[in-house]
């Protein structure tokens, strides 16, 4: 990843609002709903996966990122994947118009040059819109896949000359 792109993806986002127009009970209900969505998404991914890396070692995570690329909620799982989710999603947000995001879209990424951690960590994310078509948040799932193809089994090749031979 270029230094410039890395700087943009990791840059601090605008501060969160310091005032709220909703009461604390409603805010806690929303927080609980976000937490449940993340927990159930990560749990379902673990149950549905055939890879022991995902279903036994739990190298997976789910998160919700707001429309500005800020982490809104993360599930219990592998902590570093929560932050890689954010980076991949931020890259998607930077290129949103290029890919014509819309309701029902789902994106998959694993490229370290575009926000990913390393090739075996796949990020699947989809935008969530309100009834007016405004982007509210992005639901993300990330998991480590044992083999991504490439020159050597396992996705790690010491003599890889490019991303394609690495896998």
Predicted regions and their residues:
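Mobile "lid/hinge" segments at catalytic clefts and subdomain interfaces of large enzymes
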Residues: 134-167
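Long, charge-dense accessory insertions within large macromolecular proteins
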Residues: 2-86
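Regulatory sensory and allosteric helical modules in signal-transduction proteins
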Residues: 67-74, 86-111
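A short, polar/charged loop-to-alpha-helix boundary motif
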Residues: 80-91, 146-155
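Short solvent-exposed loop/turn micro-motifs enriched in small/polar/acidic residues
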Residues: 55-57, 99-100, 119-121, 163
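A short, hydrophobic, proline-anchored segment that marks a local hinge/packing element in signaling
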Residues: 121-131, 140
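GAF sensory domains
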Residues: 108-111, 119-125
